[in-house]
């Protein structure tokens, strides 16, 4: 009896590599930004960098942007795919904004030259549990909600699990693609799904995807093992502290440690 073939793993838009390939296309990049921010009437992209690493001169800590884009009005967009709810998205957005400012403000320029920027996180979960499909944040005076501080910076979160709020037809299509929901009636969704299907079927592209996933599994396994070791060390330290607090003999503590090795 022949064994049934295992179903191939499908790599969707939320995969880092797939998302990077999609965003390398200027046409896709423009369409996605226009879908998220239709009110800006963006007509052209003049510069984009995909999987762009930034390490500030004053710091050893760098950040990798999934996609950094500049339009013809000199506005900047940082577009990130977020698949894990780390509960620090506010700080993450703040950090990304600061790095965009550092990257775009030339040495010697004053803050007056800061460009308008949009930090966009496409999330596979509802980051704020209000059910909105599109969250947008600005700074307001605490007691006067009509008074907005114009920092020329914007934070947006696209919630693929949301059901509330009016959004563009294009953004609805992007959300369908994130959820791997076929939507042939939506032009943008149909186009993106076809490209993603090609990446999954092309042998060379698929090999790169599988290699990337294997590296992620290795790194996760190493991280988990390291975490277990650190937890074990903390437990031993706490036990030793407890022994000492109860005036245990040193020989007894050594015997305990010997039994654990």
What are these regions (language model features)?
Residues 1-154, 164, 222:
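Accessory alpha/beta interaction modules
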